[in-house]
């Protein structure tokens, strides 16, 4: 029996408010006179150079025009490693919220037991964390005022539940100053978060929780929402919709597609089977034309022991060496079945064997996987029995095949980066620089092939994928996929996707010293901004592992333009809208005040009012994509810290 079921009876009443109403929001049934709607709260992050950034999210409180302050999710506290949210968002809650118009949100983060690590010469190193005064950090409060044209409105209705997404994003780059000159490094935190009713990214949303029920006929299943590694709190419930032809399921080590996967899920035990769905959010209408709701459509689902179970623990990380059936993992996270997690700065070990079940996430083409399918360079999530021997090395034995201790390994899509050396039909050679942001120098590829693997001529099987137009030898490329089986190289890697600089999400970041600047822009119009980097202490564009120094000789600061959102459906909220924000520390210690805008012109108009001598610009962080040929950075979000 899964511990989430054992502890179910101990959940607080506040965490279970109106579960029936929440289900109605997903299925567009009646909710009559509850006086509540739904706020689907998601968490994401804008990345920075951290190997871990673990803090507690203590609370999220909305301020309504009528009801005043209302805390979502009751007293539930979630421990979050925000570095794991660079490619996905997590559904934090599907909370019942009183009908009202909400104009702001207040998020409380607790740094008392924070685990924040940075990379020092390829080694994850735990940092000393301080606030702006140099003192140890405890709780920090971020108050965000919504765009006045896009407030969070839960409307009273008798036809169907009103439901709105609230997308929270933690900008790690704008929130932190890292001093690498100290030993260990020092991280000064001034948390910067945004909140909006439309996300400023198109990331998939992970929805985790124990199964309530499933229906092949309806094409859906329903879960209690338990984000991250939570085993106690149920933060509402949600119905997830399946594509009968394309949704990929991996359940107890077996892969299914579409309705067959839902039928297999139907055979599992409600309440004890843990699931995690990777979904796309789709705003939708209701029976009342004035009220909107939404759907979460799954592309990939994990369930049962493939995801987690009562008997085993998990270990996630990058395989940097393999000796026989012993894997060495760098930057690993231990996931205990109590709900606790632990980031490991030191290398950890996973033991494999013929009984280890191996699967590949969101993949139906890799067949015949076994314990020899795991090789150096692969990102994995393993399940097995955890121990901490006298050596002090975190060890996970995933070699067993018993019913109460089934070892398993999930192969997770891994990203290579480096200049292209050459290419031909079905193949490419890469001058490999990093794997999942780790420098190639930390990998010991011994055993991956009969001959030595050479990073400077790393062989990639591209299959039917074409090298993008305009890519020549020396051009940087980003390749996603999995490593080839242990001992089989070359090729060294099987590619699932090949991307170039112009299509990979990046970050433009400009920092000034503690005195800041009152003139951060050389141009500032309703169509674009150009940052004056001449007096900046640092100015870079980071695209994955690539760094472009904007202060280097001959560099020209790019024009930053807002991303144009795709055309939406009339009468429905947008699933994606760019977001632009400005904010600073207030006179109240540990409190940041931020104002968000979906309108770029409104944001630009506000900048000269906010950036003055008393509150100069300290950091500017834009997320988006960079076009080197036009020297243009197209921003889905811009955060200004002053």
Name each model feature, range by range.
Residues 466-468:
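Alpha-helical scaffolds that organize eukaryotic protein assemblies
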């Amino acid at each position: 029996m899964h511990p989430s079921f054992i502890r179910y009876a101990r959940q607080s009443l506040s965490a279970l408010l109106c579960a029936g109403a929440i289900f109605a929001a997903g299925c567009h049934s009646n909710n009559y006179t509850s006086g509540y709607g739904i706020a689907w709260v998601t968490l994401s992050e804008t990345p920075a150079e951290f190997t871990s950034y673990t803090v507690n999210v203590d609370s999220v409180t909305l301020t309504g025009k009528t009801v005043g302050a209302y805390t979502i999710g009751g007293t539930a506290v979630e421990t979050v490693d925000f570095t794991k949210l660079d490619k996905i968002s997590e559904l934090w809650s599907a909370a019942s919220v009183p009908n009202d118009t909400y104009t702001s949100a207040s998020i409380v983060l607790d740094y008392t037991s924070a685990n924040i690590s940075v990379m020092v010469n390829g080694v994850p190193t735990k940092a000393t964390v301080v606030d702006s005064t140099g003192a140890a950090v405890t709780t920090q409060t971020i108050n965000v005022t919504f765009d006045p044209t896009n407030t969070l409105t839960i409307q009273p209705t008798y036809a169907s539940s009103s439901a709105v997404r609230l997308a929270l994003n933690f900008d790690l780059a704008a929130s932190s100053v890292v001093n690498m000159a100290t030993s260990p490094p020092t991280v000064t935190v001034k948390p910067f978060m945004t909140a909006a009713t439309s996300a400023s990214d198109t990331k998939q949303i992970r929805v985790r929780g124990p199964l309530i029920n499933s229906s092949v006929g309806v094409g859906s299943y329903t879960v209690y929402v338990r984000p991250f590694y939570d085993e106690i709190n149920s933060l509402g419930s949600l119905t997830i919709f399946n594509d009968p032809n394309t949704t990929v399921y991996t359940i107890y080590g077996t892969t299914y597609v579409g309705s067959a996967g839902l039928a297999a899920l139907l055979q599992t035990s409600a309440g004890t089977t843990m699931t995690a769905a990777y979904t796309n959010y789709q705003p939708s209408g209701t029976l009342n034309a004035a009220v909107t709701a939404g759907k979460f459509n799954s592309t990939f689902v994990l369930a049962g022991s493939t995801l987690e179970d009562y008997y085993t623990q998990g270990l996630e990380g990058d395989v940097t060496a393999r000796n026989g059936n012993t894997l060495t993992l760098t930057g690993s996270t231990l996931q205990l079945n109590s709900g606790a997690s632990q980031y490991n700065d030191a290398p950890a070990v996973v033991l494999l064997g013929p009984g280890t079940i191996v699967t590949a996430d969101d993949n139906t083409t890799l067949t015949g996987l076994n314990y020899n399918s795991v090789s150096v360079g692969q990102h994995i999530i393993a399940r097995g029995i955890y121990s901490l021997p006298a050596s002090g090395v975190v060890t996970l034995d995933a070699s067993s095949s018993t019913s109460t201790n089934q070892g398993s390994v999930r192969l997770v899509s891994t990203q290579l980066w480096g200049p292209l050396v050459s290419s031909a039909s079905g193949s490419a050679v890469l001058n490999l620089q990093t794997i999942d942001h780790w420098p190639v120098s930390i990998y010991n590829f011994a055993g991956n092939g009969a001959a030595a693997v050479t990073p400077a001529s790393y062989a990639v099987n591209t299959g039917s994928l074409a090298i993008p137009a305009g890519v020549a030898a020396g051009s940087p490329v980003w390749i996603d996929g999995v490593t080839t089986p242990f001992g089989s190289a070359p090729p060294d890697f099987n590619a699932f996707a090949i991307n170039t600089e112009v299509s990979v999400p990046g970050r433009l970041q400009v920092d000034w010293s503690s005195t800041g600047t009152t003139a951060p822009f050389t141009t500032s119009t309703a169509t674009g901004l150009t940052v004056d980097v001449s007096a900046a202490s640092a100015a870079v564009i980071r695209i994955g592992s690539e760094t472009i120094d904007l202060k280097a000789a001959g560099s020209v600061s790019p024009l930053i333009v807002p991303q144009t959102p795709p055309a939406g459906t009339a009468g429905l909220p947008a699933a994606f809208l760019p977001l632009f924000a400005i904010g600073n520390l207030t006179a109240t210690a540990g409190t940041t005040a931020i104002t968000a805008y979906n309108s770029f012109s409104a944001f630009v108009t506000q900048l000269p009012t906010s950036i003055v001598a008393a509150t100069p610009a300290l950091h500017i962080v834009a997320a988006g994509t960079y076009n080197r040929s036009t020297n243009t950075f197209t921003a889905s979000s811009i955060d200004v810290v002053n």
